[in-house]
Each structure stands twice: as C-alpha cells, then as structure tokens.
C-alpha cells in the first residue's frame, strides 16, 4: 500500500469513526444496546441527549476536527512542528463554532491561556465522578504519527511540542 493510501485511510478512518461515534459518546456498551437496539454499525443522527445533538448524521465532532486542523497545519509547515504551528491549528479550529462548542475544559482553558486571557475553569475543580476525563491531546495528535512513520522518538517529541 502506498504512503498516500495509508495516510488517506488513517484520515478517513478517524473521520468515519468520529461521525459514527457522535451518537453514542459517553454511553456504555450496555446503554448503546438499549438505546439503539444493538451495536451501532452505521452512521446515525445523534440523539437529543448527547453532545452532538442537533447535528446531521455523518458530521464530525471535535474528536476529528482537532486532528484535521492539526494535520492541515503540519502540511502547511511542511512537517516542521513548533509551538506556533500548534497554536495556529488550535486557534483556527476554535474559530469554527460548530467544532468549538465541543471544546472540553482543558482545551478551552489552553486556548484562553494562549490568548493571554484568564483561564479560570470551575469545572477543573470538580472531582470527576463519571469515570471520564478530557482527552483533547489524544484526539488531535494522530497526524504526528503520519508525518513520523517509524520514528517514535520524533513522534513523541512532536507530540509534546503540540500538546
């Protein structure tokens, strides 16, 4: 398989997986079976009780869109990863209300801090009792693996720089 097809497949897999998961986010496997009559094996319209409510079936959320804008910036910078490229990607992503509405508390606080605004977030002081935590870094970073195939040390360093 060509490098192009591997990269395209990675990007498409992430986008489709995000669009499929938008309707089930935060649900347990048991609840998914209850709510949808079994496991979800196609793209469906997100119900009114999830983060993606109001979106059409097939729309991506912050999970893919953060990675997409990170990838675009990596391409624009010809694979040179630095803090400024990371900021540009994050600020561009945040300028799209349809994606920024999904921003988790750590991503929102990071954007405010990078803009020089006070990043007080009351959610950060509440103990998480729902077995969930934010994962803005994890969901946006797969493009770093695409530009560093076989070079784990560089991928780790680029991940640290971006996140």
Predicted features along the sequence, with ranges:
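Structured, active/binding-site neighborhoods that engage oxygen-rich ligands
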Residues: 1-163
